[in-house]
């Protein structure tokens, strides 16, 4: 039985970065949820109606990126993100500056013609899309790429800042970080100090760098005998 929680999670992951019906159906299958096409369309429409900020954000990113590309050297912005295109670097590279100041690079920006596919099969039609060079081949650049990279990159920068604060604080030496996994920090602690460590992790995880002031942030903590993947955001590994 499909729960609203499951569908809501899949919808957020599939649609938040510009995905539509196809992306929702594909991600739902990954979570072993079967959706009919009509049902998926209804979910997409409902999600976008409930999240009007999303399409405004996507279009703002794309407009800023294209405006920067049109005039090399000009800096454009979309909220806290900035873009600049250098035609004399890496074969023509678009840069996106994250709120932290870190730059993401899209080198050798080019238009290309690609086959239109439906249900994984070519239709015989062609379309033109913007693409950039990757380690292996080229990848499409569209508002979904920019949105995903901006959100994931900013989240990673916030997590790195948290890790640095914990690891450089002598008072927290009793809870060494053993690893990070996506949006999780895993510490090794004694069982006697588990509650103390969880409170500290929560405090540190909810402390934003100055450049991230005002961004929404949530945290969940858990202590366990050994690491396991679950629905929590932070874990303290008790020993």
Identify the function of each model-found stretch.
Residues 1-239:
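Conserved catalytic core of nucleotide polymerization and phosphodiester-bond processing enzymes
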């Amino acid at each position: 039985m499909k729960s609203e929680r499951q569908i809501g999670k899949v919808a957020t992951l599939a649609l938040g970065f510009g995905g539509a019906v196809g992306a929702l159906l594909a991600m739902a299958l990954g979570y072993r949820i079967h959706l009919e096409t009509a049902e998926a369309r209804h979910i997409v429409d409902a999600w976008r109606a409930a999240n009007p900020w999303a399409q405004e954000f996507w279009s703002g990113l794309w407009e800023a990126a294209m405006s920067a590309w049109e005039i090399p050297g000009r800096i454009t912005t979309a909220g806290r993100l900035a873009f600049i295109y250098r035609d004399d670097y890496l074969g023509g590279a678009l840069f996106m500056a994250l709120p932290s100041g870190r730059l993401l690079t899209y080198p050798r920006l080019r238009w290309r013609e690609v086959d239109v596919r439906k249900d994984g099969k070519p239709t015989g039609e062609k379309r033109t899309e913007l693409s950039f060079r990757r380690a292996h081949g080229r990848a499409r650049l569209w508002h979904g790429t920019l949105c995903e990279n901006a959100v994931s990159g900013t989240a990673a920068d916030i997590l790195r800042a948290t890790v640095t604060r914990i690891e450089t604080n002598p008072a927290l030496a009793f809870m060494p970080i053993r690893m990070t996994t996506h949006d999780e920090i895993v510490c090794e602690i004694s069982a006697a100090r588990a509650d103390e460590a969880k409170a500290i992790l929560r405090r540190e995880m909810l402390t934003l760098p100055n450049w991230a002031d005002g961004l929404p942030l949530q945290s969940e903590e858990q202590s366990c005998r050994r690491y396991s993947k679950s629905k929590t955001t932070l874990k303290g590994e008790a020993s």
